[in-house]
């Protein structure tokens, strides 16, 4: 691991490249450009940037209209506001007609920290995953966030991409894998337990696997960056190989990655199964590291939970 960079920062940098090479891409924000990092586009290419103020629903409806004219709108706001305030518009104005709009939501999960439970969205993956035809992505690091941003610009259809406020380690060497929509990446092979993780929890899962190795437990770690459509073939293969499955997400254990993996395995693979995430609770204010620990989402806590459930 090397530098720590937030996935939202990589997203902002990728947008600069996109608008410079693709004249169809436009960037929309709802008065949070400095936080979502779309400010980079606003400064470098103001003709490509639209600030709608605190009006997320209007922003999404406008993006839907833009898409009918052949543009590729990237809408940015906090996950709480995308999944909360603009949900009807995302469902009915974007997904229902299957318009080519990208909803890129930052500040997701409890790692938002001091902003508190009102802003720590732990329901967004579930809400977006249930919308018919919606592709749902949660990058693990800055490199993957940039690659995903570039990839979804070329993908025709509605996309929800979940991004983080917190700066986290950028993968290096063998950990850097190609980003292909709908294809999981195996970051560590193992035979005793398969850990399926997404977003910031991928790095924590790798650290947890190191802890498990000290006790002779050989854990595989698989990065599920595309939660929908999930890589069912990969999930099935590793569940069958290990016979024990753990899912890890900085999201409610209801409706997110854990349920997506369970849907694949149910009735097909006989294995032990346990979900690690936020257990039917709201978040709370505090430093990101402290809040993650409060919800059992640090590597040492995860290792202990995994040992107790395999």
Residue ranges and their predicted role:
Residues 1-162, 167, 178, ...:
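Thiamine diphosphate
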């Amino acid at each position: 691991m090397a530098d720590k960079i937030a996935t939202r920062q990589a997203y902002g940098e990728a947008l600069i490249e996109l608008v410079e090479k693709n004249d169809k891409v436009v960037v929309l924000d709802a008065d949070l450009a400095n936080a979502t990092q779309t400010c980079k586009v606003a400064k470098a290419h103001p003709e490509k940037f639209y600030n709608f103020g605190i009006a997320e629903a209007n922003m999404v409806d406008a993006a839907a209209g833009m898409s009918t004219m052949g543009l590729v709108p990237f809408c940015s706001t906090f996950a709480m506001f995308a999944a909360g305030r603009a949900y009807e518009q995302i469902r009915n104005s974007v997904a229902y007609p299957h318009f080519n709009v990208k909803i890129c939501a930052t500040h997701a999960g409890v790692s938002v920290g001091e902003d508190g439970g009102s802003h720590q969205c732990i329901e967004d993956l579930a809400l977006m995953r249930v919308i018919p035809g919606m592709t749902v992505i949660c990058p693990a690091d800055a490199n993957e966030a940039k690659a995903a941003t570039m990839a979804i610009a070329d993908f025709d259809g509605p996309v929800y991409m979940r991004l983080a406020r917190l700066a986290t380690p950028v993968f290096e060497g063998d950990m850097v894998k190609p980003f292909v929509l709908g294809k999981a990446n195996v970051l560590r092979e193992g035979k005793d337990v398969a850990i399926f993780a997404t977003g910031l929890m991928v790095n924590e899962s790798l650290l947890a696997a190191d802890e498990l190795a000290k006790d002779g437990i050989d854990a595989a770690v698989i990065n599920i960056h595309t939660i929908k459509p999930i890589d069912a073939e990969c999930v099935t293969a590793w569940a069958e190989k290990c016979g024990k499955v753990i899912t890890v997400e900085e999201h409610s254990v209801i409706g997110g990655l854990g349920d997506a993996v369970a849907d694949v395995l149910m009735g097909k693979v006989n294995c032990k199964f346990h979900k690690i995430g936020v257990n039917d609770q709201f978040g709370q204010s505090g430093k990101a590291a402290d809040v993650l620990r409060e919800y059992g989402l640090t590597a040492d806590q995860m290792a202990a939970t995994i040992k107790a459930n395999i």
